[in-house]
Amino acid sequence: GKSYYEDNEQGTTMTSEVGTCADYYFMYDDGSQDGVISAIRTLTGQATMFPLWTMGYWQCRERYKTSDELAGVVDKFRELQIPLDGIVQDWQYWGCDSNWNAMKFQNPYYINKVNDPAWTKYMPEDLKKLKTQGEPRLKSPEEMVKYVHKNDAHLMISIWASFGPWTDQYRELKKMNALLPFETWP
């Protein structure tokens, strides 16, 4: 439905096609934007300031394929003395990897299973090539997080509300006929 606002010589009215009752708060202080914000703070309280590091530079790209690649980016920023407050691990659980998703953090490369065909059968081809690069220096998700923190940065893992048809969640929800009828990625 629609809501209407009218302000004329007879007065100010607000009406709604669907609402039968509404509560309105009119905020006015001294006619300035700061005055309006002051009036809102009187009603809601003052918002807490975010920590300073949240307002700094955050490095994000489509994805980092390994913990070593992510750590290498942090290293390069530090080497070049470029300020870096956070780094984002994005979307590696997408696609065919049934072991890395919103529920499981078990990419075969991270948990030293790259030589196990059961763990790598759905692994994208570009990640299979990593087998030849030797042992990773960071051998677990915990080590990666500690490394980023030790180098004075924060880590954010981007989780999208999506999962591929190879994941355990997808198969379980499909059996229950509990999936919404639209395509997810991939």
Which residues make up each language-model segment?
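Catalytic-domain carbohydrate-binding cleft regions of carbohydrate-active enzymes
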Residues: 1-186
